[in-house]
Amino acid sequence: MLTIAGVEFESRLFTGTGKFSSSQLMLESIKASKSQLVTVAMKRIDLKTGADDLLSPLRQAGVRLLPNTSGARNAKEAIFAAELAREMLGTQWVKLEIHPDPKYLMPDAVETLAAAKTLCERGFIVMPYVHADPVLCRRLEEVGCAAVMPLASPIGTNQGLVTEPFIKMIIEQAKVPVVIDAGIGTPSHAAHAMELGADAVLVNTAIASSASPIEMAQCFKDAVDCGRRAFEAGLGRVQTQAVHTSPLTGFL
């Protein structure tokens, strides 16, 4: 069982809500994934007009909402978005995202750390999206973040675990849950992240852009489950030298 800020999750697959062709398809895919924590971009929510109504179907599904600050270019904008989410959605939880560069969407480490410190002081449960930087993740943990979310590769690229060496370091030293976010493009990527010891993964594009999002959501669910079970079972040690599986003496 995964625990974040005192809340238990049976599923270690978190999902997003972007890029689906319809709200109904999004809802069915989330149900198929068995995800219990779903991210929602604050910039997509308009309670006055009801445009792109995500909230009603998600609440009907019984999932916990994780509003994110995607679109924020600095700490000030991210803090404003988080406060807005708390007021509109009634939740302290926030996925902190600050990426001022619209081309590569790389997270701004300096602004993220500053925003995280302020939000934690204000009582938010902060889950920051960051580059796979072990030092930064430790600093975020020290200021009170409930989890860290290092990227596997750039958002939406489906490149997989490009940052694997650094993710291993983060997992090794972290005292809070490590959720691998961004760039996970296939179920095998998700399984591998779990085999490394990640506590959870967040997947959006790979499911939403699939030819069959509902089926792909089920595939990711199974992959995450198998990857976690393999990690808990204990993976064999990787070696460069061959090791005999049967004795070479006693039968000749």
Curated annotation (Swiss-Prot):
GO terms for molecular function: thiazole synthase activity. The active site is at K95 (schiff-base intermediate with dxp). Its EC number is 2.8.1.10. InterPro entries: Aldolase_TIM, Thiazole_synthase_ThiG, ThiG. Pathway: Cofactor biosynthesis; thiamine diphosphate biosynthesis. GO terms for cellular component: cytoplasm. CDD domains: ThiG (cd04728). The keyword Transferase applies. SUPFAM superfamilies: ThiG-like. Keywords: Cytoplasm, Schiff base, Thiamine biosynthesis, Transferase. It comes from the Bacteria. It is found in: Cytoplasm. Coiled coil: none annotated. 1-deoxy-D-xylulose 5-phosphate binds at G156, A182, G183, N204, T205. It catalyses: [ThiS sulfur-carrier protein]-C-terminal-Gly-aminoethanethioate + 2-iminoacetate + 1-deoxy-D-xylulose 5-phosphate = [ThiS sulfur-carrier protein]-C-terminal Gly-Gly + 2-[(2R,5Z)-2-carboxy-4-methylthiazol-5(2H)-ylidene]ethyl phosphate + 2 H2O + H(+). One of its GO terms (biological process) is thiamine diphosphate biosynthetic process. Belongs to the ThiG family. Homotetramer. Forms heterodimers with either ThiH or ThiS. Catalyzes the rearrangement of 1-deoxy-D-xylulose 5-phosphate (DXP) to produce the thiazole phosphate moiety of thiamine. Sulfur is provided by the thiocarboxylate moiety of the carrier protein ThiS. In vitro, sulfur can be provided by H(2)S. This is Thiazole synthase. It comes from Shewanella sp. (strain ANA-3).
